[in-house]
Amino acid sequence: MVRFEKVHLVLGLALVLTLVGAPTKAQGPVCGAGLPDKFSRLNFPEGFIWGTATAAFQVEGAVNEGCRGPSMWDTFTKKFPHRCENHNADVAVDFYHRYKEDIQLMKDLNTDAFRLSIAWPRIFPHGRMSKGISKVGVQFYHDLIDELLKNNIIPLVTVFHWDTPQDLEDEYGGFLSGRIVQDFTEYANFTFHEYGHKVKHWITFNEPWVFSRAGYDNGKKAPGRCSPYIPGYGQHCQDGRSGYEAYQVSHNLLLSHAYAVDAFRNCKQCAGGKIGIAHSPAWFEPQDLEHVGGSIERVLDFILGWHLAPTTYGDYPQSMKDRVGHRLPKFTEAEKKLLKGSTDYVGMNYYTSVFAKEISPDPKSPSWTTDSLVDWDSKSVDGYKIGSKPFNGKLDVYSKGLRYLLKYIKDNYGDPEVIIAENGYGEDLGEKHNDVNFGTQDHNRKYYIQRHLLSMHDAICKDKVNVTGYFVWSLMDNFEWQDGYKARFGLYYIDFQNNLTRHQKVSGKWYSEFLKPQFPTSKLREEL
């Protein structure tokens, strides 16, 4: 373990091709000693991509327009409204109708890129091509991508951000079945051929660890499957088998990724493009320094290596094979060959870090947690917190964890290109939720972004990690899964009481200043 204390469509497309064709390692960071007095994009490598991120289900709305079919999250929010704060994404923040307005917000932020996802059931309403293609849905993403390029904003497209078509859930259980591999590959291949001449940055899957564990092991997210013995959620799950299903889901997901990437690399329109997976690890510190053992390496295998090791080396980490045993599916030799080297870069979503607490095995109640032999805690055995957590914050702020993870990936996974595909600060404003003036004064979010950019800068300059892009989560407040609309992550405040009006927050103003092509007038030393 390593320890460390802008104007026409043609022009827009040319910009994309120029950046894709550039050297993998961004060039020329300004690596001075100590905390820079003035801090901006000029302190980072030339060609570094700066952006914001969203996901289709969380922002689009318009669930009954353009022949869009239902996803498993539509079903989950309607079937279990109490598990999503009695909210749903039928309207969300209406990005489907307001994307042109929202692209102007991106321009106001001075960003280079925008991460979006394609809603599978908006393209294939029933999950597969033979059951019908929505021409309206296909055209929507053409229009969105064209509008981005017209405004010199690079699209980074996620093929799957958790919205499995409900028809495939009903037919065979979605990712629980190996049948999903063929259907996902068909869908992904369609998007590559449809948009590949315009889009040169792709992600197959967003946060596979969260998708599998939270959906099929602890039941926190859709489809909400778990065993009755899971603390906190077992009483809510109507079906499931913890300790088994999540591993099968991820196995099918990884094979879906491998076959989709094979299709991508044989797609002529996609030539010059790059593709990866967006992982979502936390960093772990030992809760008790006197009893560390192998807990940190093991839990990082379970949270990151579970999906990164197969796409890098062709198989699961040995620690997972040892701990999970027969419950962990096996790859064939042909599948290992297809998986190995199946990403051009590593996407990483980073939010927080935790203390790793050693626990005993529990063979009678298997789960991801008991298999990893690690539970999580925000405090050490001596009562020290992992990081600061403002009263309304959703997660502890520990920016060093970002640097540690980047260095860990470099040292253990072949020094890949890395894109920070999400990094953001969530807050629950409570009784002030609808107070626009209060909600836009998000100084804690500004501080969070500043600290994490400095940590990323250290990883690039001091650890020589090949980071080439950074995306804030999120452009604007949106539907945050089981938290509904209570958790706000945006650089823009959404006024849910007043026609979903967008208001730039303090963090958005700072980010726009940071991204100007010249050094800002503000001094970072004074702000921190």
Swiss-Prot record:
* InterPro entries registered for this protein in UniProt: Glyco_hydro_1 (IPR001360), Glyco_hydro_1_N_CS (IPR033132), Glycoside_hydrolase_SF (IPR017853)
Cell location = Endoplasmic reticulum lumen
The UniProt induction remark is: By ABA, dehydration, wounding and salt treatment.
Coarse class of the primary localization is: endoplasmic reticulum
Q: Catalytic residues?
A: E207 (proton donor), E422 (nucleophile)
Q: Deletion: any effect?
A: Reduced growth, yellow leaf, defective stomatal closure in the dark, increased transpirational water loss, sensitive response to dehydration, lower germination efficiency and decreased ABA levels.
Cysteines engaged in disulfide bonds, as pairs: C226-C237
**Tissue localization of expression:** Seeds and hydathodes of rosette and cauline leaves.
Reaction catalysed by this enzyme: (+)-abscisic acid D-glucopyranosyl ester + H2O = 2-cis-(+)-abscisate + beta-D-glucose + H(+)
> What is any one of the record's Gene Ontology cellular component terms?
plant-type vacuole
Q: Where is this motif: Prevents secretion from ER?
A: 525-528
Q: Which key words are in the record?
A: Abscisic acid signaling pathway, Disulfide bond, Endoplasmic reticulum, Glycoprotein, Glycosidase, Hydrolase, Signal
Q: Which GO terms describe its biological process?
A: abscisic acid metabolic process; abscisic acid-activated signaling pathway; carbohydrate metabolic process; defense response to fungus; ER body organization; positive regulation of abscisic acid-activated signaling pathway; protein polymerization; regulation of stomatal movement
Q: Summarize where a beta-D-glucoside binds, as residue positions.
A: Q58, H161, N206, E207, Y351, E422, W473, E480, W481, F489
pH dependence, record text:
Optimum pH is 6.0.
Query: What is the residue range of the signal peptide feature?
Result: 1-26
What glycosylation sites does the entry record? N189, N466, N499
Q: Tell me, what is one Gene Ontology molecular-function annotation carried by this entry?
A: identical protein binding
Highest taxon of source: Eukaryota
Q: What is its EC number?
A: 3.2.1.175
Miscellaneous comment: Polymerization into higher molecular weight forms displays diurnal fluctuation, similar to the ABA level.
As for what it does, the entry says:
Hydrolyzes abscisic acid glucose ester (ABA-GE) which represents the predominant form of conjugated ABA (biologically inactive). No activity with beta-D-glucopyranosyl zeatin. The hydrolysis of ABA-GE in the endoplasmic reticulum (ER) forms free ABA and contributes to increase its cellular levels under dehydration conditions. ABA-GE hydrolyzing activity is enhanced by dehydration stress-induced polymerization into higher molecular weight forms. The ABA produced by BGLU18 contributes to the initiation of intracellular signaling as well as the increase in the extracellular ABA level.
The family note in this entry says: Belongs to the glycosyl hydrolase 1 family.
In its UniProt entry, what is this protein called?
Answer: Beta-D-glucopyranosyl abscisate beta-glucosidase
Q: Which organism is it from?
A: Arabidopsis thaliana (Mouse-ear cress)
